[in-house]
């Protein structure tokens, strides 16, 4: 069973790791598109409703995505048809439940939307750990930046964040 709970040092998880793009869409999506092309990346995983919607709207279709249908801006992802399947899971705030972890394991294979009842934020760590080589994980930072993580470049360092999670 794989379940993690954020118990301490929440501040470390709010830090804008490692490429923060402080531009509004479509420019932010264009920057990631260029990063993908220039870096030879093959997979893009988005975490969050606004990021996923922006990628879809501006033609950069994620390999898979995780959404919770709750945003500060009231934006909903409506183009689930861009994906082969939708997997619904329960994942409370500050957790990566076993159910959510299993859904991300399926999602890294491609074509899956993980639709979360609860909160999807922590699933970015699951994507970082499970994504295949040549992947980018993208999510929105609460202060407005688009965060893009080239997994091969940063995985080892970012996985140290698991040291601050408790097994549940």
Swiss-Prot record:
GTP binds at residues 49-51, 68, 70, 120. Pfam families: DUF359. GO terms for molecular function: GTP binding; kinase activity. Its EC number is 2.7.1.237. InterPro entries: GTP-dep_dephospho-CoA_kin. The keyword Disulfide bond does not apply. It catalyses: 3'-dephospho-CoA + GTP = GDP + CoA + H(+). Pathway: Cofactor biosynthesis; coenzyme A biosynthesis. Keywords: Coenzyme A biosynthesis, GTP-binding, Kinase, Nucleotide-binding, Transferase. GO terms for biological process: coenzyme A biosynthetic process. PANTHER family: GTP-DEPENDENT DEPHOSPHO-COA KINASE (PTHR40732:SF1), UPF0218 PROTEIN TK1697 (PTHR40732). Belongs to the GTP-dependent DPCK family. This is GTP-dependent dephospho-CoA kinase. It comes from Pyrobaculum calidifontis (strain DSM 21063 / JCM 11548 / VA1).
């Amino acid at each position: 069973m794989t379940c993690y709970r954020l118990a301490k040092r929440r501040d470390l998880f709010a830090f804008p790791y490692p490429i923060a793009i402080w531009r509004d869409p479509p420019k932010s999506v264009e920057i990631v598109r260029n990063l993908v092309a220039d870096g030879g990346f093959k997979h893009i995983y988005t975490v969050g409703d606004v990021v996923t919607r922006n990628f879809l709207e501006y033609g950069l279709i994620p390999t898979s995505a995780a959404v919770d249908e709750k945003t500060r801006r009231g934006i909903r992802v409506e183009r689930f048809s861009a994906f082969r399947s939708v997997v619904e899971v329960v994942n409370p705030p500050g957790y990566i439940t076993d159910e959510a972890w299993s859904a991300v394991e399926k999602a890294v294979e491609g074509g899956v939307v993980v639709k979360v009842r609860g909160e999807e934020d922590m699933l970015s760590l699951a994507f970082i750990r499970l994504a295949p080589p040549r992947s980018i994980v993208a999510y929105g930072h609460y202060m407005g930046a688009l965060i893009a993580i080239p997994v091969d470049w940063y995985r080892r360092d970012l996985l140290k964040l698991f040291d601050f999670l408790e097994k549940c």
